[in-house]
Curated annotation (Swiss-Prot):
Principal subcellular localisation of the protein: plastid
Gene (UniProt): atpA
Keywords (A to Z) from UniProt: ATP synthesis, ATP-binding, CF(1), Chloroplast, Hydrogen ion transport, Ion transport, Membrane, Nucleotide-binding, Plastid, Thylakoid, Translocase, Transport
UniProt entry tagged with the keyword DNA-binding: no
Organism: Pinus thunbergii (Japanese black pine)
Protein name per Swiss-Prot or TrEMBL: ATP synthase subunit alpha, chloroplastic
EC nos: 7.1.2.2
Length: 494
């Protein structure tokens, strides 16, 4: 047996001590006390922030919303079927954020901005917080450019400007989504990026909208964020904020964007479900006390940026569903008070065959004519007045049997004006076509036609102007005014 050399052993031990690296990791950990209905109650996580992302043992991610003295209430962003009582939870130290890039255009994503259209990954190097603060007063300027929807009733009487928030409100099945999708289709040549957020809708309805966009070439400038009816409430609640974050990315790059939330009633219901399960005290209609803030912080992110920030814009068109035309319910009144005007779609008009079924009498745009070109202002003023007088007369005429000639003429004119506001779905009109149509109606050129012939005549007129009088459209597009020359060209055509 060889002798043990102490100096050798001591040098080996010294080397081992020098190489020893004890890495200390401090983790904010917790244990699941209870899980179910998309909610987990967690013991521990002493230093977690409100809204922080937490990760469960099975990889499911949640958001810490309720911070109690002895436990934390978190909502799950997934089904969480593998989470059990006693499972470990780790605080990530991050607030919910999503990747953003131009590569999102033409894609369908979920509330976490992950693609769900089967077209592979989306490359992005930049991240933005889902809950970003809205631009301040100094960062904004007043709305002054029109956002053309392609619908005569809206562009002439309820004009929408870039950076505005215009609510679309009405009962189910009255064409609210059709107004929104037509607006997206009309942005094809307007250099506006569109974001369509589907919240709690049937998957078949969302697929139909996406197909329409694909067929009409609108997906090239559109992003669809979809969380369908079978998605967890947490993701339905997050989807609008994800859409707003994607739209803001383009706004700060000096581009114009338009975002449609379809619809915010479903988001409020998802938030109510989460809040009740988290045992937050219910308020009116069982909604939590902060449901107003839920929508106000979302819609305040729509803005027209100042010239120092590049004059980008986000125009928000939120949709809210009413029950039997009751606009005095909680969510509709909240949305009306937050937005800069509302477009009412009426079930009575829809059933009477007037499409789009927009009730022009009670719809309003608080930005108003600031968002119209001069040519439209000139012809549209008369239209609104004549339609208002017609609505009044029509109600009166139901009781009167013998009407004088002037009243009969006014009623006949009103019926023809109402006819010219009718439009097929997915058939938006250019500004010059709208101006020609309105001028024709308000100046009595349609009075000689039967009501059934009005739309046929207008179709012929638009076709004739494009083919034989292209200068008419060029004048309006280039100058934005209804000049004497344009008027003469139109009257020649008539």
């Amino acid at each position: 047996m060889g002798s043990i050399r102490l100096d050798e052993i001591s040098s080996i031990i010294r080397k081992q001590i020098e190489q020893y690296n004890n890495e200390v990791r401090v983790g904010n950990l917790g244990t699941v006390l209870q899980v179910g209905d998309g909610i987990a109650r967690i013991h521990g996580l002493d230093e977690v922030m409100a809204g922080e992302l937490v990760e469960f043992g099975d990889g499911t991610v949640g958001i810490a919303l309720n911070l109690g003295s002895d436990n934390v209430g978190a909502v799950l962003m997934g089904d969480g079927l593998m989470i059990q009582e006693g499972s470990s939870v780790r605080a990530t130290g991050k607030i919910a954020q999503i990747p953003v890039s131009d590569a999102y255009l033409g894609r369908v994503v979920n509330a976490l901005a992950q693609p769900i259209d089967g077209k592979g990954k989306i490359s992005a190097s930049e991240f933005r917080l889902i809950e970003s603060p809205a631009p301040g007063i100094i960062s904004r300027r007043s709305v002054y450019e029109p956002l053309q929807t392609g619908l005569i009733a809206i562009d002439s009487m309820i004009p929408i400007g870039r950076g505005q928030r215009e609510l679309i409100i009405g009962d189910r099945q009255t064409g609210k989504t059709a107004v929104a999708t037509d607006t997206i289709l009309n942005q094809k040549s307007q250099n506006v990026i569109c974001v369509y957020v589907a919240i709690g809708q049937r998957a078949s309805s969302v697929a139909q909208v996406v197909n329409t966009f694909r067929e009409r070439g609108a997906m090239a400038y559109t992003i669809v964020v979809a969380e369908t009816a079978d998605s967890p409430a947490t993701l339905q609640y997050l989807a609008p904020y994800t859409g707003a974050t994607l739209a803001e990315y383009f706004m700060y790059k000096k581009q114009h964007t338009s975002i449609i939330y379809d619809d915010l009633s479903k988001q409020a219901q998802a938030y109510r479900q989460m809040s009740l399960l988290l045992r937050r005290p219910p308020g009116r209609e069982a909604y939590p006390g902060d449901v107003f803030y839920l929508h106000s912080r979302l819609l305040e992110r729509a803005a027209k940026l100042s010239s120092q920030l590049g004059e980008g814009s986000v125009t928000a068109l939120p949709i809210v569903e009413t029950q039997a035309g009751d606009v005095s319910a909680y969510i509709p009144t909240n949305a009306i008070s937050i937005t800069d005007g509302q477009i009412f779609s009426s079930a009575d008009l829809f059933n009477a065959g007037i499409r789009p079924a927009i009730n022009v009498g009670i719809s309003v745009s608080r930005v108003g004519s600031a968002a119209q070109i001069k040519a439209m202002k000139k012809v549209a003023g008369k239209l609104k007045l004549e339609l208002a007088q017609f609505a009044e007369l029509e109600a009166f005429a139901q009781f009167a049997s013998d009407l004088d000639k002037a009243t009969q003429d006014q009623l006949a004119r009103g019926q023809r004006l109402r006819e010219l506001l009718k439009q097929s779905q997915s058939a938006p009109l250019t500004v010059e076509e709208q101006i020609a149509t309105i001028y024709t109606g308000t100046n009595g050129y349609l009075d000689i036609f039967e009501i059934a012939q009005v739309r046929k005549f207008l179709l012929g007129l638009r076709f004739y102007l494009i083919k034989n009088k292209p200068q008419f459209g060029e004048i309006i597009r280039s100058t934005g005014t209804f000049t004497e020359e344009a008027k003469a060209l139109l009257e020649e055509a008539l």
